[in-house]
């Protein structure tokens, strides 16, 4: 007689084993109709799974995040159902849930076109609208293998052979004549899967290994209702308009090419952005009393072995040989910073020692994962490492948190999600050390009034960490900042200091990044601002345009005056109509468009309009320069107003 305890604390007793769907029906027909699955003692289960003992039960519907994830997973199976009807020879690989949707990797000789994808989507919708039941069967390993062998599903057989124990009982989900294998849970009926769209097709190697066959990966998105689907597609349209690769080309900021995959060729205006970002962070380093250092680009393999990186990261490291020695281009800066710390005897009085570098790093990312500035092989980190005593950890972490929030606020990012990753199962040090480390991070977060989520067991083996994820104007999440405690690397590389009692002690090392990769952060900013950078960051802050040749010398004078005062100004003396010039520089997103005719020249003025079309009227050149300089010094996010 199972007793079911619901989230509100109420209990329901049943004479026999029941399913989540039975419990929902006992509560009411509306809930039974909406029930997708159940959370039984914290674990998601299919709505049809029997409950035989006393449990805590939460009934999952599409109003729950888990419910939406479940219907997305079922849409992946629906895709399998449809593609097997249209191309029966297709071999199905894997079809997981991803952010906002799902994908399925398929082995199909026919190369799918846009027209094929549109027809596939129609077939999926036609199948879903029949509202057929999804039938779950738990079978023996052998029955599952026999099922897929009879259907020629070689990838499903490989998953069974390589990933599932013969003692296990896999779950098969039957979508009419189509059968798939999955941990589940899945929707009980396809009435929940009416609001989806197939988005694109890409190549993907089986198991992510380039030695294996290239499959076709079909991406889709799925939502609980029509309104949510439409809102998501609208966000995607806006994101496409803001795509940093598209805007980067329009504004002539940078380019990538095949001869240097994942490496950025910065053009003049793009490099101006990069340097301004670096200048801003360098100013922050001064405010928070960091030393700035520069380490070598590559170091002997021996050092990477001592640091432990060779064992963990060698596949992602670029290597070269010279004079019978093997070198690795650095994928990160920390071992180099320990070498600088180790030069000369350090005392406890020298701590904390804050060491920062704009470190040029390289990682051999898979070519298929490269994506504009967001995922590159060569990148610059705003990296820092703080060497301190254990007693100083909380204060130093608190300083890092302040720096992160100060920095993000300058760019207009205020919606920051903070996560604290705690001790993993495999770790160095004793529980007392981890207790102190985790408490220090929690105290630092509390001191800064920061709400945070704890991720149990997600810390590195050498220490807990804090992650900062910012949300942009399209509500996309970007994990940028990290504060990571490290109790291992200093000891591995022989870092010590003389303590107050004259003993030799190993410092705690704090890895700190705020922007992360400057390239990636610039990609985020390009999309956040849609290329309309704040004045302080804009490559060209003002462009001065003449109406006729008579004003050419005056334009030169105005531009020189602006440049002498630190304003990035340019001129446009082309023999074109002024309306044409204004349109062109508006498309270049220049913050201020300054027009001079005879009257402006006579009165030593400029006629000012913003890139958004706001007419600020005629302003004396000295006054305008002072106004813009103030904007720049304040790093204002807004343009001047009427």
Swiss-Prot record:
Q: Name one GO molecular function term.
A: threonine-tRNA ligase activity
Just give the chief location class. cytoplasm
Name the EC number(s).
Answer: 6.1.1.3
Name where it's found.
Answer: Cytoplasm
Q: How does it assemble?
A: Homodimer.
**Assigned protein family:** Belongs to the class-II aminoacyl-tRNA synthetase family.
Q: What is this protein called?
A: Threonine--tRNA ligase
Q: Which gene encodes it?
A: thrS
